[in-house]
Structures are given as structure tokens and as C-alpha cells.
Amino acid sequence: MTTNLIWILYRSDSDTAYKETLNCKKIIEGYGKKVLFSEISNETNNINQLFLKSEVLPEITIVLGGDGTVLRAARYLSPKNIPILSFNVGGNLGFLTHDRQILKQETFWERVSNNRFNIQKRMMLEATVFREKNNNENTIKKSFFALNDFYLRSCTDEIAPTCSLALEIDGEAVDRYKGDGLIFSTPTGSTAYSMAAGGPIIHPSLDAIIVSAICPMSLASRPIVVPPESQLVIKPIRGMKQKIKLWLDGSSGCLIEAEDTCLIKKSNHSTSIIILDENHSYYKTITQKLHWASSLNNPNKQ
């Protein structure tokens, strides 16, 4: 990492994130680094402009926002293997972000300028939507990457929002789901939508794919964890009047029509997450974020 270039991406709807961006830029430039920055949101993608402006890739990218901002940034930065250092500025839970107060510490900036930090590799998923043609050949309709999850849900407003989906894993029929949809999650995303749907929490150092049904009509439809090399194929059950949409990390993907097939698998790309704490504990993170064991950490609480 000797390019002396650092990017900053900030949450577009946060004045605080923009002000923090200007402060960070000033400090980083004081260490002899060049800084380029841009806003990021669901509606606008200015990251490609940074790629065009930069003759070299950045050493790291600082992301100022919440987990959603990090997820959006990861889709563009991970294929280039650019490490992400994120801070919770205007976000919510912040499983992927550091406390923004760290930005005020002079020792922090010295560590960043000298590349004194750890990097965690986080598994990503890839989804490819195929369209079946009359000659039974499939053509690629769309491809997407996600750090947290993909999910398929009904997008019909006129009738009850349920959908019927068939799932195959490695060529073997597994289940036919009827309900609000299906979630396909990484271990990083296991504390997001999948957890809300009753899925297990998986340590992010593991590679696995979690399949969780959203409000299934059958009590037999339970979450399942499959190996990372699994090939998961999802097809709308034909003959049903339904419109289904693929979502990635909470952002709109594309419509899945009756003649479409969606293949979900582990991506060849991974997200590089910078961890500043040398004694970082994932269990401490989820205990704090999910308020577990509060009576153990606070002996005065009964």
C-alpha cells in the first residue's frame, strides 16, 4: 500500500457525514496523502467517477455512514480488493462500523498513515438471473454481488404479497416455499434480515450460506445452513399469478419472471474490512449491539 491515495465515501443524506469528510480530508492531507471523496446513496453511484479520476487505486477507502453505506460501497470496492475502514456517522446499529469518536484520536491517524491495522476478509454472494428462451437455452439477464444478503419477495400490490418458490441445491430439489419470500445470507448478513426471519447467527470468519424463509405458510420450512461451495437455484413456481423481485443488501435488483431462474453462490470476490482493535471480539460486538448479557456486564442490574 504505497499509492498515498485515500478515498472517502460519505452518506449522501447526512450533513454530519459531509462535515466529517471535510475534517478527515484535512487531517489525512496533513500526513502527505492525497484524498478524493464522494457521496454515496441508493439513488446515485459516484464511485465510478472516483475510478475515472484516479490513476491508481487507493490504499484504503474510509466510509462514513451506517452499515447500509458500507454495503453499497462494498459492491464496487470489493472487485478491486480495496480495503474499507468505516465509521458510524448517521447510521443505526453499526455491526460493520467503528465508533466515530475514534476519528478525533491523533494516534488513530498515525496508525492509518502507517498501515497499522488488521484486515478481515468477508465472504460475498453472487446472484445471476437467467432467462429461458424458446430453444431451452439460458441467457444471462442480470448479475449482482452482495455482502449481506439476497432476498426474493413478492412485488405485487393488488393481491396478497405472497410468492411460491422452488429451491434446488446442487441439482437436488430441496423445498417448495410459499410465503413472503426467501433470504440467502452470508455470515456477515446473519445479524440482518436473516436474523429477523429466525435465521441463526454465524461467525463472520466462517464461510457458509444461510437460507431463511420469510413468514412461510408451512411450519416445516426451517432455516438451513449450507456449505459455501453450494449452488442454489431458485425458480418461481409456474402457473401461479405472482410478481417476484430480487433485492440485494436492501437495494432493488430486478424482477424475476416466470421463465427466469436465479442462481446464488459464493462470489469470487470478498470484502476487506479494516479492524482497528487489535483485541477485536465479535462476541463483544453482538453482545453490545443486541444487548445480550446486560446483567452480566452490569452487576447493579437485577
UniProtKB/Swiss-Prot annotation:
The keyword NAD applies. Coiled coil: none annotated. It catalyses: NAD(+) + ATP = ADP + NADP(+) + H(+). It comes from the Bacteria. One of its GO terms (cellular component) is cytoplasm. NAD(+) binds at residues 67-68, 72, 148-149, 178, 180. Its EC number is 2.7.1.23. One of its GO terms (biological process) is NAD metabolic process. Its main location: cytoplasm. GO terms for molecular function: ATP binding; metal ion binding; NAD binding; NAD+ kinase activity. The active site is at residue 67. Its cofactor is a divalent metal cation. Belongs to the NAD kinase family. Involved in the regulation of the intracellular balance of NAD and NADP, and is a key enzyme in the biosynthesis of NADP. Catalyzes specifically the phosphorylation on 2'-hydroxyl of the adenosine moiety of NAD to yield NADP. This is NAD kinase 1. It comes from Prochlorococcus marinus (strain NATL2A). The lineage of its organism: Bacteria, Bacillati, Cyanobacteriota, Cyanophyceae, Synechococcales. The gene is nadK1.
